[in-house]
């Protein structure tokens, strides 16, 4: 690539072989003369011209030329310059450097040089009448041109002479107003209003008016339709528009790029395919979709080809902007742009000052097009950059100082608001920011009578005590206010309550001393401190020395006759009936007794209205048995209500208990009762979750839960609810084992929803709902966390059923209950083919465009980007593939129900079940049948073993638990034949197919009482965690 100067008398043949002279007209009316070599690309020529202005944003500009037919064409950047259809006449080829692609506003442009070139291009288009503008708008724009070039108004004569030199008034405006003086007067009238505006402001205001014109940024081409009616075809980055030949302002038809399918040209015909759902399929002459409408225009072949090339480039520019919207910088404000343009000066002054006057040809040599004054301009530019950097750093420092002052003002306003209870109006708020909610601080200030405070010489002892009493009473009142504040933390509330009690105690001591002196002097004692104490009793938690919580709303249910304990503080009266609890104990024994007094009843976290099958609140309204009850009742199989009441020390009576008429649940389990399984549909039956916990981990967890007095597992689990006769009759809502797979457990999941997993929820029964909204209390949340921990441990050690779930990835499938997590190896595409809108590739670096321009006679361009989508990921393909395994099985028609306690992450289960569906079902059915036979044969052995354990407190409690669990298993074993069949049919296909052969072949112990020992390797008597292992025979399958 080389640029050389040649004389004007060069031969035509020499031009074709060695190069051709070209003259580039710049936007500032200068001309750049070059010798273009045959191998020079149009893109390289554009780079050379752009470097003359130090232009960085070259994507908006292009180089145009006029062909032999007089139509304007553009150089295609990927082709060589001399390959274009230039006129064959001798002389240099005239090229025009101008804007090709327009945008909404100049605020999106980064460089000031680009903005100034857009301004020069707009002036040129208006002057050459490429943009239709009303004459009044022309006069206003001419005034801005004068303000930008000449500054403020000086005189009418100067303005009239300047208007003759500047390209301000187009010929069309002069035709509409034949009087030149009238046009000049109108311009002067607007010009006088612009006094004081800087050059940058004039440019910004000029561009704002031009950008609001409907014809700005549209390339117009004269075409005809099939009937020969002339039209204007407008092309821009927004789409293709059809205008009436006598009206370029209002389009008659609009075709946006997102609605277009293909662009064709063939000789004199240019066609577009548009999505039109209202169009009938018979109007489509070729094969394809039915909602496609074809629009065709006609012109000469050269113009048709030019229109087609411009349409392709505009669509590619549209795609580039659409795909790079995330990379587009934030728009600058117009005021900031005006300041920058004023400081940097004119473009021609900074770049072309040494090039000579306007109209002079700029010649280049040795391939360099930079002017001789470029070094000086570069040095000035570096100095300006340094100055701007210094100003920017100063601005940042001032902004930081302002931010600090605003923070200080906010703190002062908040302190004032805490004192007054109202936020001051001076509080600084950002746009759209809500004022903060301020809580008024508890006032503790007080004022005393000076006569009582100031001593008067030798004061008597009684006067001194009266003065101290007056001060201490005010201090006590202030401490009471602080202790009554409900918006502080629990720890701070305890500290304030302690301070309040100490103040009361000191006040009582002072009054006692006063009464002693009054009695000595023969006066009557007073009771002022007692009255203050009676009025100052505050409602607060009694668990200041214990972490076990009981909610305040449970007080209405406590009807036991607890004898009030006297307060250790002197002078404190007994609590009113609404606070019928003992105060914080001062000894360890008192703390232990208080724990069982306070936890008399636990309220169910489940609202009764959500359960229509049975009242599930009844198992929660139970009596907490004391630890001594475990020793006294270990020899009983099922302790009666009376024994339980006696174990409570006689302080609690159950005659008025809310559970008087119900079966007496003496269990520590807080799991809700199970509705009768005979009225539930088969698809709610689930298999046992397999949780891999090592024996060492189980032992450590067992020791941990053994020492927690409030834990579920430390008290054992008594699942029986029969009378003293031992009849196997059960209450209708039978209990479940809290093994963590209960779908009615609380809704918290032990795993989080990952972005790479897809959860397909199941169709839930109307009687089952989540419990998140029902129990917002922190106490109940902690209680449910302990239940979940116990449930997870119980499920790990649960041995009432053989482990039917595969370990590892699919091991948790059985425990997932309902709802399946599908971990997709490749995420489905987020794009979908929509009927009315084409599909574009958003993430690609460049738009995918199919172009077939092989000759000068015809061409085809696909507007819609080609995009192939896998069948598995289109319009629900992933859903169909996931659930394909259960399509042919009647038992699989029901959806899976999600487990509410612990959902394990599993791979896609539907695909596994599609291979060996029959074998998996048969294996599960056979395993269930073998387990049922072993359980039936060994039942009598469990009953015998349940009466031979030790009578110690620890082993006695465990023995009672195991014997009751054995009894429950025997009482429900009569329903096992039906449940085996229902379970086999209702198990999801994915769970049946995931049974490993190794676990099917393994033979677990026949005794459900020793399954925990078989799984964990621990002795049953050494592990108090038994609530999840002794479950009913069908428990593992229906949960």
Curated annotation (Swiss-Prot):
<dbReference type="GO" id="GO:0090162">
    <property type="term" value="P:establishment of epithelial cell polarity"/>
</dbReference>
<dbReference type="GO" id="GO:0030674">
    <property type="term" value="F:protein-macromolecule adaptor activity"/>
</dbReference>
<dbReference type="InterPro" id="IPR041785">
    <property type="entry name" value="FRMD4A/B_FERM_C"/>
</dbReference>
<feature type="compositionally biased region" description="Basic and acidic residues">
    <location>
        <begin position="912"/>
        <end position="929"/>
    </location>
</feature>
<dbReference type="Pfam" id="PF09379">
    <property type="entry name" value="FERM_N"/>
</dbReference>
<dbReference type="InterPro" id="IPR035963">
    <property type="entry name" value="FERM_2"/>
</dbReference>
<keyword id="KW-0796">Tight junction</keyword>
<dbReference type="InterPro" id="IPR019748">
    <property type="entry name" value="FERM_central"/>
</dbReference>
<feature type="compositionally biased region" description="Polar residues">
    <location>
        <begin position="1013"/>
        <end position="1023"/>
    </location>
</feature>
<dbReference type="InterPro" id="IPR019747">
    <property type="entry name" value="FERM_CS"/>
</dbReference>
<feature type="compositionally biased region" description="Pro residues">
    <location>
        <begin position="571"/>
        <end position="586"/>
    </location>
</feature>
<dbReference type="GO" id="GO:0005856">
    <property type="term" value="C:cytoskeleton"/>
</dbReference>
<feature type="region of interest" description="Disordered">
    <location>
        <begin position="366"/>
        <end position="386"/>
    </location>
</feature>
<feature type="domain" description="FERM">
    <location>
        <begin position="20"/>
        <end position="322"/>
    </location>
</feature>
<feature type="region of interest" description="Disordered">
    <location>
        <begin position="879"/>
        <end position="968"/>
    </location>
</feature>
<dbReference type="InterPro" id="IPR018980">
    <property type="entry name" value="FERM_PH-like_C"/>
</dbReference>
<feature type="compositionally biased region" description="Basic residues">
    <location>
        <begin position="623"/>
        <end position="638"/>
    </location>
</feature>
<keyword id="KW-0965">Cell junction</keyword>
<feature type="region of interest" description="Necessary for interaction with CYTH1">
    <location>
        <begin position="358"/>
        <end position="420"/>
    </location>
</feature>
<feature type="compositionally biased region" description="Low complexity">
    <location>
        <begin position="946"/>
        <end position="966"/>
    </location>
</feature>
<dbReference type="InterPro" id="IPR021774">
    <property type="entry name" value="CUPID"/>
</dbReference>
<feature type="compositionally biased region" description="Low complexity">
    <location>
        <begin position="788"/>
        <end position="800"/>
    </location>
</feature>
<feature type="modified residue" description="Phosphoserine">
    <location>
        <position position="800"/>
    </location>
</feature>
<dbReference type="InterPro" id="IPR018979">
    <property type="entry name" value="FERM_N"/>
</dbReference>
<feature type="region of interest" description="Disordered">
    <location>
        <begin position="553"/>
        <end position="680"/>
    </location>
</feature>
<feature type="compositionally biased region" description="Low complexity">
    <location>
        <begin position="366"/>
        <end position="382"/>
    </location>
</feature>
<feature type="modified residue" description="Phosphoserine">
    <location>
        <position position="530"/>
    </location>
</feature>
<dbReference type="InterPro" id="IPR047176">
    <property type="entry name" value="FRMD4A/B"/>
</dbReference>
<dbReference type="Pfam" id="PF11819">
    <property type="entry name" value="CUPID"/>
</dbReference>
<protein>
    <recommendedName>
        <fullName>FERM domain-containing protein 4A</fullName>
    </recommendedName>
</protein>
<feature type="region of interest" description="Disordered">
    <location>
        <begin position="772"/>
        <end position="813"/>
    </location>
</feature>
<keyword id="KW-0175">Coiled coil</keyword>
<feature type="modified residue" description="Phosphoserine">
    <location>
        <position position="711"/>
    </location>
</feature>
<dbReference type="GO" id="GO:0050714">
    <property type="term" value="P:positive regulation of protein secretion"/>
</dbReference>
<comment type="function">
    <text>Scaffolding protein that regulates epithelial cell polarity by connecting ARF6 activation with the PAR3 complex. Plays a redundant role with FRMD4B in epithelial polarization. May regulate MAPT secretion by activating ARF6-signaling.</text>
</comment>
<dbReference type="InterPro" id="IPR000299">
    <property type="entry name" value="FERM_domain"/>
</dbReference>
<keyword id="KW-0597">Phosphoprotein</keyword>
<dbReference type="GO" id="GO:0005912">
    <property type="term" value="C:adherens junction"/>
</dbReference>
<keyword id="KW-0206">Cytoskeleton</keyword>
<feature type="region of interest" description="Necessary for tight junction and adherens junction localization; Requires for interaction with PARD3">
    <location>
        <begin position="579"/>
        <end position="939"/>
    </location>
</feature>
<feature type="modified residue" description="Phosphoserine">
    <location>
        <position position="872"/>
    </location>
</feature>
<dbReference type="InterPro" id="IPR014352">
    <property type="entry name" value="FERM/acyl-CoA-bd_prot_sf"/>
</dbReference>
């Amino acid at each position: 690539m080389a640029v050389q100067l040649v004389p004007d008398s060069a031969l035509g043949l020499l031009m074709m072989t060695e190069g051709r002279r070209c003259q580039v007209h710049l936007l500032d009316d200068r001309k750049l003369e070059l010798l273009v070599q045959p191998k020079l690309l149009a893109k390289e020529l554009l780079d050379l011209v752009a470097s003359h202005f130090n232009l960085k944003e070259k994507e908006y500009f292009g180089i145009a030329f006029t062909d032999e037919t007089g139509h304007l064409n553009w150089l295609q950047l990927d082709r060589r310059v001399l390959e274009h259809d230039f006129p064959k006449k001798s002389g240099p080829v005239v090229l025009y450097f101008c804007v090709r692609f327009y945008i909404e506003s100049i605020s999106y442009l980064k460089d000031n040089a680009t903005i100034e070139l857009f301004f020069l291009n707009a002036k040129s288009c208006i002057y050459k009448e490429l943009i239709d503008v009303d004459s009044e708008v022309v006069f206003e724009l001419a005034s801005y041109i004068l303000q930008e070039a000449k500054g403020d108004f000086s005189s009418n004569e100067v303005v009239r002479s300047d208007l003759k030199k500047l390209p301000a008034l187009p010929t069309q405006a002069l035709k509409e107003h034949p009087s030149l003086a009238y046009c000049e007067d109108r311009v002067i009238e607007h010009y006088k209003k612009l006094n004081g505006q800087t050059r940058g402001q004039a440019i910004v205001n000029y561009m704002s008016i031009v950008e609001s014109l409907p014809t700005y940024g549209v390339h117009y081409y004269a075409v005809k339709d099939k009937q020969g009616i002339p039209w204007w075809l407008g092309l821009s980055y927004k789409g293709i528009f059809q205008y009436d030949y006598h009206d370029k302002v209002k389009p008659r038809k609009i075709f946006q790029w997102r609605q277009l399918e293909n662009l064709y040209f063939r000789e004199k015909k240019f066609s577009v395919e548009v999505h039109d759902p209202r169009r009938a399929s018979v109007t489509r002459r070729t094969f394809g979709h039915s909602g496609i409408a074809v629009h065709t225009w006609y012109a000469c072949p050269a113009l048709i080809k030019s229109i087609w090339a411009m349409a392709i480039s505009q669509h590619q520019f549209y795609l580039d902007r659409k795909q790079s919207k995330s990379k587009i910088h934030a728009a600058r404000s117009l005021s900031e742009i005006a300041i920058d343009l004023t400081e940097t000066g004119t473009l021609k002054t900074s770049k072309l000052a040494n090039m000579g006057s306007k109209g002079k040809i700029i010649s280049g040599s040795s391939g360099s097009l930079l002017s001789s004054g470029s070094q000086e301009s570069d040095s000035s530019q570096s100095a300006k950059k340094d100055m701007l950097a210094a100003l920017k750093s100063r601005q940042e420092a001032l902004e930081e100082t302002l931010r600090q002052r605003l923070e200080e003002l906010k703190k002062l306003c908040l302190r004032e608001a805490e004192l007054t209870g109202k936020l001051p109006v001076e509080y600084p708020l950002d746009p759209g920011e809500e004022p903060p909610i301020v809580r008024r601080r508890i006032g503790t200030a007080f004022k005393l009578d000076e006569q009582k405070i100031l001593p008067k010489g030798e004061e008597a002892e009684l006067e001194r005590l009266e003065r101290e009493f007056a001060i201490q009473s005010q201090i006590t009142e202030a401490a009471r206010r602080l202790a009554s504040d409900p918006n502080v933390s629990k720890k701070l509330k305890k500290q304030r309550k302690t301070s309040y009690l100490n103040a009361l105690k000191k006040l009582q001591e002072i009054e006692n001393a006063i009464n002693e002196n009054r009695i000595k002097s023969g006066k009557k004692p007073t009771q002022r401190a007692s009255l203050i104490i009676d009025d100052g009793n505050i409602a607060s938690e009694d668990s200041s020395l214990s972490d076990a919580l009981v909610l305040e709303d449970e007080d209405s249910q406590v009807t036991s006759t607890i004898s009030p304990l006297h307060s250790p503080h002197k002078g404190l009266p007994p609590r009113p009936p609404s606070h019928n609890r003992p105060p914080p104990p001062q000894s360890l024994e008192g703390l232990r007794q208080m724990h069982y007094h306070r936890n008399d009843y636990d309220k169910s976290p489940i609202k009764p209205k959500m359960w229509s099958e049975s009242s599930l609140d009844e198992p929660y309204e139970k009596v907490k048995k004391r630890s001594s009850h475990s020793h006294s009742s270990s020899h009983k199989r099922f302790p009666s209500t009376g024994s339980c009441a006696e174990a409570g020390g006689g302080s609690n009576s159950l005659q008025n208990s809310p559970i008087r008429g119900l079966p007496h649940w003496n269990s520590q389990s807080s799991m809700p009762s199970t509705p009768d399984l005979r009225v539930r549909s088969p698809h709610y039956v689930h298999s046992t979750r397999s949780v891999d916990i090592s024996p060492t981990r189980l032992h450590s967890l067992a020791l941990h839960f053994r020492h927690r007095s409030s834990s579920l597992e430390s008290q054992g689990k008594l699942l029986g609810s029969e009378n003293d006769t031992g009849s196997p009759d059960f209450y209708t809502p039978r209990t479940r084992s809290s093994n963590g797979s209960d779908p009615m457990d609380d809704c918290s999941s032990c795993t989080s929803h990952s972005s790479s997993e897809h959860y397909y929820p199941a169709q839930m029964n109307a009687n089952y709902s989540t419990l998140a909204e029902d129990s917002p209390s922190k106490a109940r949340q902690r209680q449910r966390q302990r239940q979940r921990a116990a449930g997870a441990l119980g499920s790990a050690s649960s041995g009432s059923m053989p482990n039917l779930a595969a370990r590892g990835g699919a091991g948790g499938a059985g425990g997932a209950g309902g709802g399946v997590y599908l971990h997709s190896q490749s995420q489905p595409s987020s794009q979908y083919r929509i009927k009315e809108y084409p599909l574009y590739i958003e993430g690609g670096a460049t738009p995918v465009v199919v172009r077939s321009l092989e000759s000068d006679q015809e061409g085809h361009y696909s507007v819609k980007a080609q995009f192939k989508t896998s069948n598995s990921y289109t319009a629900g393909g992933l859903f169909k593939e996931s659930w394909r395994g259960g399509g042919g099985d009647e038992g699989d028609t029901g959806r899976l129900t999600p487990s509410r306690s612990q959902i394990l992450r599993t791979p896609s289960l539907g695909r596994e079940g599609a291979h060996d569906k029959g074998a998996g079902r048969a294996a599960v059915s056979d395993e269930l049948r073998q387990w049922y036979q072993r359980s039936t044969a060994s039942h009598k052995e469990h009953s015998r073993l349940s009466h031979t354990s030790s009578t110690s407190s620890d082993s006695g409690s465990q023995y009672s638990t195991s014997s009751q669990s054995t009894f429950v298993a025997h009482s429900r074993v009569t329903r096992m034949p039906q449940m085996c069949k229902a379970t086999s049919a209702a198990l999801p296909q994915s769970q049946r197919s995931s049974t490993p052969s190794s676990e099917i072949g393994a033979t677990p112990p026949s005794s459900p009482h020793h399954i925990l020992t078989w799984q964990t390797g621990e002795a049953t008597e050494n592990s108090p965690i038994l609530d999840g292992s002794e479950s009913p025979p069908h428990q593992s399958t229906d949960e």
